[in-house]
């Protein structure tokens, strides 16, 4: 039986996922988190929210792979838009991710770079292709682009401009790069799907609170369509 890991960062991001699948989930505590295990259309799915930030999402992704043996990881959640063509509730799939808060420039390394690693972390081409196929079938304007991750909630014009100029990023959040990094190191295909909840500007906090639930549901509904075809 195929095993699929499904992650969000916050409870609000996985609640619609659990509701949409509509199966009985067993709750399994591990590493300070709760993993929801169930069977959907002859696929074992493991759902969890990591809590916010790169450390938490690294722990949860590693647990999914090593303790539950998931063979694919799908991340569903919300993000802040960095570009004009990404509006509230739009969907974006990450082609690459970057840790925008990594700075070893004192040692002449480029921003985002860690020795024995790389600036950009790749996601699964096959999973992204599936996402695009589903988007075409459902007439959804799915966008592709670089997503920047860091342990800060971006809410300023200056930081937005930096992320675009330095990394050519389309959106910003706080977990995707670490999830993709863990998956890459363990050889597990990964897809990071985000729905836009704010514009990462001075009004981002208010916008995030207002649109979190709607945007999380948009991402969750699309993710379920992907699982249906895996």
From Swiss-Prot:
Catalytic residues identified in the record: 13 (proton acceptor), 198 (proton donor)
Catalysed reaction equations from the record: 6-amino-6-deoxyfutalosine + H2O = dehypoxanthine futalosine + adenine; S-adenosyl-L-homocysteine + H2O = S-(5-deoxy-D-ribos-5-yl)-L-homocysteine + adenine; S-methyl-5'-thioadenosine + H2O = 5-(methylsulfanyl)-D-ribose + adenine; 5'-deoxyadenosine + H2O = 5-deoxy-D-ribose + adenine
UniProt entry tagged with the keyword Amino-acid biosynthesis: yes
Cellular component aspect of the GO annotation: cytosol
EC number, as in UniProt: 3.2.2.30, 3.2.2.9
GO biological process: L-methionine salvage from methylthioadenosine; L-methionine salvage from S-adenosylmethionine; menaquinone biosynthetic process; nucleoside catabolic process
Binding site for substrate: 80, 154, 174-175
Highest taxon in the source lineage: Bacteria
Description of activity control: Is inhibited by the transition state analog BuT-DADMe-ImmA. This compound is also able to inhibit H.pylori growth and is more efficient than antibiotics commonly used in ulcer therapy.
Metabolic or biological pathway: Quinol/quinone metabolism; menaquinone biosynthesis; Amino-acid biosynthesis; L-methionine biosynthesis via salvage pathway; S-methyl-5-thio-alpha-D-ribose 1-phosphate from S-methyl-5'-thioadenosine (hydrolase route): step 1/2
InterPro entries named in the record: MTA_SAH_Nsdase (IPR010049), Nucleoside_phosphorylase_d (IPR000845), Nucleoside_phosphorylase_sf (IPR035994)
Keywords per UniProt: Amino-acid biosynthesis, Hydrolase, Menaquinone biosynthesis, Methionine biosynthesis
Positions of transmembrane segments: none
Signal peptide: none
Keyword Amino-acid biosynthesis: yes
Top enzyme category: hydrolase
GO terms for MF: 6-amino-6-deoxyfutalosine hydrolase activity; adenosylhomocysteine nucleosidase activity; methylthioadenosine nucleosidase activity
UniProt record similarity statement: Belongs to the PNP/UDP phosphorylase family. MtnN subfamily.
Assembly: Homodimer.
Role, per record: Catalyzes the direct conversion of aminodeoxyfutalosine (AFL) into dehypoxanthine futalosine (DHFL) and adenine via the hydrolysis of the N-glycosidic bond; this reaction seems to represent an essential step in the menaquinone biosynthesis pathway in Helicobacter species. Also catalyzes the hydrolysis of 5'-methylthioadenosine (MTA) to adenine and 5'-methylthioribose. Can also probably use S-adenosylhomocysteine (SAH) as substrate, leading to adenine and S-ribosylhomocysteine.
UniProt name for this protein: Aminodeoxyfutalosine nucleosidase
Native species: Helicobacter pylori (strain J99 / ATCC 700824)
